[in-house]
Amino acid sequence: MSGIPHDHYEPRTGIEKWLHSRLPIVALAYDTIMIPTPRNLNWMWIWGVVLAFCLVLQIVTGIVLAMHYTPHVDLAFASVEHIMRNVNGGFMLRYLHANGASLFFIAVYLHIFRGLYYGSYKAPREVTWIVGMLIYLAMMATAFMGYVLPWGQMSFWGATVITGLFGAIPGIGHSIQTWLLGGPAVDNATLNRFFSLHYLLPFVIAALVAIHIWAFHSTGNNNPTGVEVRRTSKAEAQKDTVPFWPYFIIKDVFALAVVLLVFFAIVGFMPNYLGHPDNYIEANPLSTPAHIVPEWYFLPFYAILRAFTADVWVVQIANFISFGIIDAKFFGVLAMFGAILVMALVPWLDTSPVRSGRYRPMFKIYFWLLAADFVILTWVGAQQTTFPYDWISLIASAYWFAYFLVILPILGAIEKPVAPPATIEEDFNAHYSPATGGTKTVVAE
């Protein structure tokens, strides 16, 4: 699979040769786990295995929960309470599934920001990056529909607000909204559709993950230096790489164990910490909650959605130019989806010839401002749209777009990066000096 020179699987026994000539699945598994991997990967390269664990956890717990769930507006809330009270281990299954979604998004955000910092989106890994963004979009759709299924107050009203965004599309919006809901409002048809799609999408995600893995196995892994593995010969490649098994698998298993220690502590001792108490109240279309908020992992983009009100000058200009077609609501919808889309375009927006942020002094400053901006958007997305939160969300939203659309293209032209090492071997030896038996040495970055 990888373009890096390495030893491929060779069948030895008769049964291995027979199977290999008909279905080379052993060779596929061998090339997957023995892929040459840059030897200088740091601890930010653990999130892939955490994400794989989360996907398996969500599929397994979701299948079992679906056996006991009833997708009907009169029975959904009661069926969830039945799972919690009467199904053996049902409460643990639900808490694992709900908190597993949070771990899934924590890991994917760290995975994305690691890629943004180390330039994992740059050539030749654009396809890997775009497939990763498709996975993220599928995760968001799956999580949103899953949040509706318990049929609590926040489930119902969250679905009403979010699906109402499609109604903001000029001309065809209401038709799309009605088609999506299966009627004029969130009701039984909506719940059935969301349950069916929520069950289906994890398997779509699994297929996209397989393509994602295939893509980065074809190009090889990125690494903290952004320097490519030497591919002139197998001997040269071995100076820059080690096999994924056992070196990085052991490291990933250890990291996963540490992450799961924290995860199971949350599941066991404070399983509702990341949830919302209003969702323990059955959905009531006649009673609107005082403050409607989505799950925490949607809050950054929810903040961007709410930031652009009718009194913002950008919205007023867009409304004037479009002769009233683009109002504040539609502008907010465009901004929310644009904030996600702009991440998919980053391979072409970042014009710097240097891949890794480790060697880009100006880039580091703006990147960490972006990370802080993301945290601020998450926080302000859970607040009321009153002063000063409305101004904070507007400023934070403006910086999000400015980073990708203005700062990155300009930095590529004006920044003077530090020269990266010539090879991965050179970087590895600088951090783990052979003279000290591989002991880590402190090197300024």
Curated annotation (Swiss-Prot):
Cytoplasmic topological domain ranges are: 2-49, 114-129, 217-252, 347-364, 409-445
Q: Which CDD domains match?
A: cytochrome_b_C (cd00290), Cytochrome_b_N (cd00284)
Keyword set, alphabetical order: Cell membrane, Electron transport, Heme, Iron, Membrane, Metal-binding, Respiratory chain, Transmembrane, Transmembrane helix, Transport
Where heme b b562 binds, per the record, is at 97, 198
- Which residues of this UniProt protein bind heme b b566? 111, 212
Task: Write out the coiled-coil annotation as residue ranges.
Answer: none
List where in the cell it is found. Answer: Cell membrane
- Residue ranges annotated as transmembrane are 50-67, 95-113, 130-149, 194-216, 253-270, 330-346, 365-382, 389-408
Periplasmic side of membrane: 68-94, 150-193, 271-329, 383-388
Query: Where this protein primarily resides, as one coarse class?
Result: membrane
Give the signal sequence positions: none
* GO biological process terms held by the UniProt record: respiratory electron transport chain
Pfam families per the UniProt record, alphabetical: Cytochrom_B_C (PF00032), Cytochrome_B (PF00033)
Task: Supply one GO CC term from the record.
Answer: plasma membrane
Write down the InterPro entries for this protein, in alphabetical order: Cyt_b/b6_C (IPR005798), Cyt_b/b6_C_sf (IPR036150), Cyt_b/b6_N (IPR005797), Cytb/b6-like_sf (IPR027387), Cytochrome_b (IPR030689), Cytochrome_b_C_euk/bac (IPR048260), Cytochrome_b_N_euk/bac (IPR048259), Di-haem_cyt_TM (IPR016174)
Similarity comment: Belongs to the cytochrome b family.
Q: Any additional notes? A: Heme 1 (or BL or b562) is low-potential and absorbs at about 562 nm, and heme 2 (or BH or b566) is high-potential and absorbs at about 566 nm.
Name this polypeptide is given: Cytochrome b
